[in-house]
Amino acid sequence: MSDRPAPPRFSVVICVYTEERWGDILAAVDSVRKQSLAPLETLLVVDHNERLLDRLTEEFADARRTGEVRVLANAGPRGLSAGRNTGIAAARGDVVAFLDDDAVAEHDWLHHLAAGYTDPAVVAVGGRTLPAWASGRRPVWFPEEFDWVVGCTYRGLPPGRVRVRNVLGGNASFRRSAFDAAGGFATGIGRDGDRRPLGCEETELCIRLANAVPGAVLLIDDRAVIHHKVPAVRERFAYFRTRVYAEGLSKALVAQSVGAGKGLESERRYTSRVLPAGVLRGVRDTLLGRPGGAGRAGAIVTGVALAAGGYALGTLRARRGGSPAFSWGPITPEGVPQETAAPEQPEKKGAAA
């Protein structure tokens, strides 16, 4: 008889908000239901869209009766964070995994996520997210170092199964007990459909979780692969500019919550090592006559400038009390965190982006 512990039971949460992604939603659910390690349940959380809620309820009527797929309405304010909190509150599994509604998981996705939890110190495991470009190929100017702009794993992250500060939200999992210790995703930060391309809600949560659980370990395992669709509009430089600027605003909110030391720890290495190397590669490719080198180098420089500008403005707003209010707290049965305002952080030295 094997002494190997049984894998954890997974609740997979997919937050949805628009019928325009109907085919993508069905594909995402299908990829979860075909996993080599079957999940306990798939939870579809609908973000304040009654028509989509009714349509999904009808589509998965049979699966709902068996408990394999459940369709829920977001019980909190509009936005991705509250939707995730609704899913967490309803989850019955030992581990809660999150998959984007426009992504497809590979067959062994949950199997590889589960492998990380053999260590009881591990509280979160993320995976590798590959872009599926609408045009069929990466835009020649688009640097791999900025794949986070389209919700994907970017160049500069270490390979293999490695310890990290934070996982990436569209391909992530957490022990259910982690939310009891640290609370849920902060509302007031993160995405609200397509209207607000902010992010960093998972970064803020992961730092808060590490502070709440002594010795907590967070991992990324690059064998846990999903494929994330990148629509044509997000292949354009206009979206790139908007998204990197919004990331700067988001980082300012994270620094306000957890302090600039932890909030910008990984970003300092990224901007001082990864991005300069990317610029040099772009220049080299240009000199060698390879297509797109100058564009990639220029995009990196532009991205740094815009993100820094967003961070500076977000920091100024926070000091003046004009930044968006966000809060977190214990997950209630309704899926809404009890209001806990982000604490004021003393100004720290060395907080430059």
Regions found by a protein language model. Give the residues of each.
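Glycine-rich, basic loop-to-helix element that forms the pyrophosphate-binding segment
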Residues: 74-91
